[in-house]
């Protein structure tokens, strides 16, 4: 099996077709999730006043909705786009309430189960059409991604080194890929992580795409050659390995880690609220059942602890931190936890501006960019702010496609255009790092 997806590559490695068949046909690879989303809806609302916002907050609490955006009920305010996943039974109550109060709404997804099953059907079809090579235009399970990592580690020794920095709560290895020409004892580095929130599948898809493009174009693209010769990229394709696996086997829209709380039945911590920077302040929840639960203490999650330890150890050489999320079409930089201007604002803002301009040049997709607190919302305890506060001067968070039409169910047909445009943005940021700011 060709793990670079290019039959002309001389360094490609092949595995028996039966290996891929087993991975496609094994339980959990394409899952109906026990019909758990039958009749569920995704509804968009934009409150036109603070009174409407307060009314929505109250009923969201009562109905225990799953907010797709924003990530917390506390963020619901006048003019804020609110995408709500709600069960079939609760949707009747919500729709009756909206009609009674004359709050405008739009149903984005009429039957979530059908949307999920359609996603799974397309996955199976696309995988079967490409048994001869690793397909970068489909979503892959954790097992597939780990096999991909190990194979590139064996077949690309001049550019790739894969290693583990620890284990997850459920005991899974936390794999990192070091990507770059092994030419110097000391090189500056860029950190890239994807999949800190389990349901955001486009993130891990981009991490894989980035690696493929870097390896395939290293000898032909002067910019890529310069990047890999002068920098190491530390890439974590799946940050939240337990949650990502769970999103493939049990709950497609799971967000958090899978750790247990001794006092509550609810599981998991928001891995992007668990960092030691204004921990559990605004935009985070202290309740274990909330999607933005900050955890019992900073770095309580072994996944967060392992990455924080690695970044601390290498912070003198790591000059950029890039984290990939979905969805909103934004490029964000610090601060998230406060309304303030970072000291190197002009340099970071220029890099962000050039990146979104480059991104837009590919398919015309518009991204907003700016400080996270002003562009998205105030949130505390996140990885981007932590990286910046710990001496990494370029810290960015991408919110990839789309803006809500598909939400977390971004179709596989949009993986390639999303990754192609994002690739250009990342190259722009990296080249700016090499040319401009220290």
UniProtKB/Swiss-Prot annotation:
It is found in: Secreted, Extracellular space, Extracellular matrix. Pfam families: Peptidase_M14, Propep_M14. Its main location: secreted. Disulfide bonds join 266-289. Substrate binds at residues 197-200, 255, 272-273, 326-327, 377. Keywords: Carboxypeptidase, Cleavage on pair of basic residues, Disulfide bond, Extracellular matrix, Glycoprotein, Hydrolase, Metal-binding, Metalloprotease, Protease, Secreted, Signal, Zinc, Zymogen. Binds 1 zinc ion per subunit. Its cofactor is Zn(2+). Zn(2+) binds at residues 197, 200, 325. InterPro entries: M14A-like_propep, M14A_act_pep, Peptidase_M14. Residues 138-433 form the Peptidase M14 domain. Its EC number is 3.4.17.-. Residues 1-30 form the signal peptide. It comes from the Eukaryota. SMART domains: Zn_pept (SM00631). Glycans are attached at residues 89, 153, 344, 428. One of its GO terms (cellular component) is extracellular region. May be involved in the proteolytic inactivation of enkephalins and neurotensin in some brain areas. May convert inactive angiotensin I into the biologically active angiotensin II. Releases a C-terminal amino acid, with preference for large hydrophobic C-terminal amino acids and shows only very weak activity toward small amino acids and histidine. This is Carboxypeptidase A6. It comes from Mus musculus. The gene is Cpa6.
């Amino acid at each position: 099996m060709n793990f670079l997806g290019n039959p002309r590559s001389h360094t490609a490695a092949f595995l028996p077709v039966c290996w891929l068949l087993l991975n496609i046909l094994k339980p959990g690879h394409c899952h109906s999730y026990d019909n758990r989303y039958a009749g569920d809806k995704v509804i968009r609302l934009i409150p036109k006043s603070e009174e409407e916002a307060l009314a929505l907050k109250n009923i969201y609490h009562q109905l225990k909705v799953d907010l797709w955006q924003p990530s917390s009920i506390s963020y619901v305010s006048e003019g804020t786009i609110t995408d709500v996943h709600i069960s079939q039974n609760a949707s009747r109550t919500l729709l009756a309430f909206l009609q009674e109060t004359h709050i405008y709404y739009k149903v984005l997804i009429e039957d979530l189960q059908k949307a999920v099953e359609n996603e799974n059907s397309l996955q199976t079809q696309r995988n079967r059409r490409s048994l001869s090579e690793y397909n970068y235009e489909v979503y892959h399970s954790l097992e597939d991604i780990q096999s991909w990592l190990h194979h590139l580690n064996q077949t690309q020794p001049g550019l790739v080194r894969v290693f583990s920095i620890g284990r997850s709560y459920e005991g899974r290895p936390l794999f990192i890929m070091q990507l770059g020409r092994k030419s110097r004892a000391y090189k500056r580095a860029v950190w890239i992580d994807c999949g800190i929130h389990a349901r955001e599948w486009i993130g891990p898809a981009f991490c894989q795409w980035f690696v493929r493009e870097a390896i395939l174009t290293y000898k032909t693209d002067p910019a890529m050659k310069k990047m890999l010769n002068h920098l190491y990229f530390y890439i974590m394709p799946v940050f939240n390995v337990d949650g990502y696996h769970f999103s493939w086997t049990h709950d497609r829209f799971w967000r958090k880690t899978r750790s247990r709380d001794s006092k509550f039945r609810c599981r998991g911590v928001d891995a992007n609220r668990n960092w030691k920077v204004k921990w559990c302040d605004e935009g985070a929840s202290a309740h274990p059942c909330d999607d933005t639960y900050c955890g019992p203490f900073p770095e309580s999650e072994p996944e967060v602890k392992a990455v924080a330890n690695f970044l601390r150890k290498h912070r003198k050489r790591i000059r950029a931190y890039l984290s990939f999320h979905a969805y909103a079409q934004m490029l964000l930089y610090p601060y998230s936890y406060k309304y303030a201007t970072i000291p190197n604002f002009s340099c970071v803002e220029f890099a962000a501006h050039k990146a979104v301009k480059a991104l837009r040049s590919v398919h015309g997709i518009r991204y907003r960019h700016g400080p996270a607190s002003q562009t998205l919302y105030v949130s505390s305890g996140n990885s981007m702010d932590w990286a910046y506060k710990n001496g990494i001067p370029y810290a960015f968070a991408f919110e990839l496609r789309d803006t809500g039409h598909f939400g977390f169910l971004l179709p596989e047909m949009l993986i390639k255009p999303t990754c192609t445009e994002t690739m250009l943005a990342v190259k722009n940021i990296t080249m700016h790092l090499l040319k401009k700011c220290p």
